[in-house]
C-alpha cells in the first residue's frame, strides 16, 4: 500500500517539481479552531494531524501555507499549493473548481448566539423569523446557507470568524452562523464566554480535501491514504481528540 501511494504521489507531483519529490504543500486557514490554529508559533489541529499522518506514509515532509478561507481556492488554482486541507465542505460550486477526495467527516452549520438570548433562539421558528441580523464568515458555506435559506436576513459578512464573533458580542448582529466543527470550541474560550453555540445542525455537509482539477493522480493517492487511515482507526481517533461534542442531528 505504501509503495503504491508513494508512486501515485510521485506521478502527481512530477510535473510541478521536475521529477523531484519535494514537500507536500498544504493550504490551511487558521480561522477554524480546532481545524488548524497556532499555539505560539506551532500549527496544531485536525488537518495538521491528518497532514502529518499523510507525510508519515510517504516518507516526506509537509509544508503548510496559511491563507484566508476565500484565498485558498485561488492559491490552488495558481499552483501555490498542492492540496487544501481546511475542513472544506463539498459543494457543487466548489467541485466545479477543484477535485475533491472522498469525504472524511460529516458536519453542518450551527447558530452562535449571546448567552442571554439562547432560550429565545432555541424556540421553534426563532431562526426563520424575518429581518434577523446574521453574521457569517465571508466565503464559507454558512454565508451561502444564510443568503439562500433564511428569511430575508440582513447579512453581515466578515473577513474572519473572530471579527464576526466580536460583532456578535457587541450586539452588531443577532447571531452568527458557523460550521459545527469549530463552533463549540470557539464559544468555550474565555474571550467568548458570553456566547453559546446552539448544538443543532442547520445543514448537513460532507467535508473533504481538495486538489487541482488537473491532478487526478494526487486525488487518487490521497483517497488511498484516507482509506488506509479509516481502516486503521486513525481518522476517528483524530476527530475524537479534537471534537468531543457531537451535535444533535437535524
Name each model feature, range by range.
Residues 141-155, 194-197, 227-250:
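Ligand-binding clefts/hinges and TM-proximal coupling segments of bilobed small-molecule sensing domains
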Residues 19-88, 92, 96, 241-242:
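Extracytoplasmic small-molecule ligand-binding "clamshell" domains
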Residues 101, 114-133:
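Flexible hinge/capping segments at coil-to-helix
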Residues 24-28, 124-139:
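Short loop->beta-strand "edge-of-pocket" segments that line small-molecule binding or catalytic clefts
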Residues 71-74, 86-96, 148, 169, ...:
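A ligand-binding cleft/hinge motif common to bilobed small-molecule-binding domains
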Residues 63-74, 156-170, 205:
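Short helix-initiation/N-cap motifs at beta->coil->alpha
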Residues 29-30, 106-113, 180, 184-227, ...:
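Periplasmic-binding protein-like
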Residues 13-14:
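N-terminal signal peptide c-region/cleavage motif recognized by signal peptidases
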